[in-house]
């Protein structure tokens, strides 16, 4: 970023202090939830340093990928750690359970109706004639987006489905 000197130095000091505090929290805290939050703080501070170094794409990727992965880590930690006394004593049917049931019923039916009607051949062999491919007009981020939307569309979607199935499997294993 093009920031004035004092503001840039304050942000660097804030990021360094956050890194030290978060690193100590990861090592010293015994609760896995607090430790995962501390690791999230470390990763957000690293992303701040990428922003300060004018590497915006890497900073956003750091936030989306690594901090998002920390949220998954928190979910796994909550699932595998013993539940609280309240969750063992009371068994209520909540609005969230009904909403989840509705989603679990409607999503497979919508997939069964849309997947057979999709022209997969047209998706796999999308031409780039209607896109700007002149190297001077697009940057690296746009090139990554073009490749994900054309060449790697089907593998990208398959990987997301595999991750979804693994998350559902982990939730099922944790409940048993």
Swiss-Prot record:
It is an enzyme of class 7 (translocase). It is found in: Plastid, Chloroplast thylakoid membrane. The chain crosses the membrane at residues 10-30, 33-53, 60-80, 95-115, 152-172. Its main location: plastid. The keyword Cell inner membrane does not apply. The keyword Transport applies. InterPro entries: NAD(P)H-Q_Oxidoreduct_6, NADH_UbQ/plastoQ_OxRdtase_su6, Nuo/plastoQ_OxRdtase_6_NuoJ. Keywords: Chloroplast, Membrane, NAD, NADP, Plastid, Plastoquinone, Quinone, Thylakoid, Translocase, Transmembrane, Transmembrane helix, Transport. GO terms for molecular function: NADH dehydrogenase (ubiquinone) activity; quinone binding. Its EC number is 7.1.1.-. It catalyses: a plastoquinone + NADH + (n+1) H(+)(in) = a plastoquinol + NAD(+) + n H(+)(out); a plastoquinone + NADPH + (n+1) H(+)(in) = a plastoquinol + NADP(+) + n H(+)(out). It is a multi-pass membrane protein. It holds the Pfam family Oxidored_q3. Belongs to the complex I subunit 6 family. NDH shuttles electrons from NAD(P)H:plastoquinone, via FMN and iron-sulfur (Fe-S) centers, to quinones in the photosynthetic chain and possibly in a chloroplast respiratory chain. The immediate electron acceptor for the enzyme in this species is believed to be plastoquinone. Couples the redox reaction to proton translocation, and thus conserves the redox energy in a proton gradient. NDH is composed of at least 16 different subunits, 5 of which are encoded in the nucleus. This is NAD(P)H-quinone oxidoreductase subunit 6, chloroplastic. The lineage of its organism: Eukaryota, Viridiplantae, Streptophyta, Embryophyta, Tracheophyta.
């Amino acid at each position: 970023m093009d920031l004035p000197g004092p503001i840039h130095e304050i942000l660097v000091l804030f990021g360094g202090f956050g890194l030290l505090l978060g690193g100590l929290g990861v090592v010293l805290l015994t609760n896995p939830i607090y430790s995962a939050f501390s690791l999230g703080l470390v990763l957000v501070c690293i992303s701040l340093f990428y922003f300060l170094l004018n590497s915006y794409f890497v900073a956003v990727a750091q936030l989306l990928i690594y901090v998002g992965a920390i949220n998954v880590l928190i979910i796994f930690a909550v699932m595998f750690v013993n539940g609280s006394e309240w969750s063992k004593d009371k068994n209520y049917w909540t609005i969230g359970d009904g909403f989840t049931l509705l989603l679990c019923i409607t999503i497979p039916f919508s997939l069964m109706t849309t997947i057979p009607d999709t022209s997969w051949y047209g998706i796999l062999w999308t031409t780039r004639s209607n896109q700007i491919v002149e190297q001077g007009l697009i940057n690296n981020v746009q090139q990554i987006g073009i490749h994900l939307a054309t060449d790697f569309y089907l593998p990208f979607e398959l990987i997301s489905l595999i991750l979804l199935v693994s998350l559902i499997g982990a939730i099922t294993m944790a409940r048993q």
